[in-house]
Design a protein with these regions (language model features):
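Flexible helix-coil linker/hinge segments at domain or subdomain boundaries
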Residues: 24-28, 92-107
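Short, conserved micro-motifs composed of acidic
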Residues: 103-126
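C-terminal reverse transcriptase regions that engage the nucleic-acid substrate
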Residues: 5, 119-235
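Conserved beta-strand elements of beta-rich interaction domains across eukaryotes
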Residues: 1, 69, 74-75, 132, ...
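Well-ordered, non-membrane alpha-helical segments in soluble/globular domains
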Residues: 76-100, 149
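RNase H-like nuclease fold core
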Residues: 235-256
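A short acidic-Thr-Gly-centered motif at the start of a beta-strand
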Residues: 47-54, 229-238
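Conserved pre-motif C helix in the palm subdomain of viral-like polymerases
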Residues: 1-58, 64-65, 75-87, 161-187
Length: 256
């Protein structure tokens, strides 16, 4: 369905399904006909890093029509329980055609995607356009996506102007990729946002030397993160080791 075609009330329904899944984790549920698509092979080798965790945690998130489940409890019994909670929880709000009698539409849980192993429990998984490594706590872009972004940036450096609507699409792609996957990447977008400010609809953006320099920097950074995944600790800052009142009116690092 995608973000643009999703009415606001759909997100309310998907969030409700997420809440139902959270509660169903506490309940023993019957088998679901699709659960075997999600469960790993009984002999699959699980990452040692995750098995050694002392405290376990379950996380369920909904992004428009995508449901994301995360856990560090890798016992098969828990994966079965989590899988059933997700399947039954989604079907409790978005019921299958066999219940509603609806004809001509797609089922709420895509069997085709499950057959492509998109729902399989894995510690390395592509989620919302990013490859997440739950054992090593890293994040990176798929190689094909990096190559496509680099090709776009190289083309931009050869142009003098570009239509606003095309520039907006490129800026959105770059922002999704750089602001989330490059430490401090947001700081490179000041000139990009400034270039669009005040530009009339259906207007053109002049690709100045400053913009082209930023494109060169981004191209180099994307090449670097493609070779070395980014640790999530670099993206989400922790609290400082020492913090307190810096002066009488401002709270920050340092103190007297």
């Amino acid at each position: 369905m995608g973000w643009c075609e999703s009415p606001p009330f759909f997100c309310a329904a998907s969030e409700m399904a997420r809440d139902v899944i959270q509660q169903l984790l506490k309940v023993d549920l019957p088998p679901h006909p699709f659960e075997h698509y999600m469960l790993p092979d009984a002999n699959a080798t699980l990452p040692k890093e995750a098995q050694d965790l002392a405290n376990t945690m379950d996380l369920i998130e909904a992004f428009v029509d995508d449901f994301i489940g995360c856990t560090d409890n890798l016992t098969r019994s828990h994966l079965v329980k989590f899988t059933r909670a997700m399947m039954h929880g989604m079907h409790s709000i978005f019921q299958p055609p066999s219940v509603t009698g609806h004809k001509g539409g797609d089922p709420p849980i895509s069997k085709k995607k499950l057959e492509q192993l998109e729902g399989l429990w894995e510690h390395v998984k592509e989620i919302l356009g990013w490859i997440l490594d739950g054992a090593n706590y890293t994040i990176r872009l798929p190689e094909k996506k990096v190559e496509k972004i680099q090709a776009t940036l190289r083309q931009l450096r050869k142009k003098k102007t570009i239509p606003l609507n095309e520039f907006q699409k490129i800026a959105g792609t770059l922002h999704h990729a750089a602001s989330m996957g490059i430490p401090g990447g947001r700081g490179l977008f000041t000139a990009i946002w400034s270039a669009m400010k005040g530009c009339q609809k259906n207007g053109w953006i002049k690709l100045t030397p400053d913009l082209k320099a930023i494109f060169s920097d981004l191209c180099w950074l994307f090449r670097e993160i493609a070779n070395k995944p980014i640790n999530v600790a670099q993206l989400v800052p922790n609290l400082p080791h020492c913090h307190g009142y810096a002066d009488a009116c401002k709270y920050g690092a340092g103190g007297v």
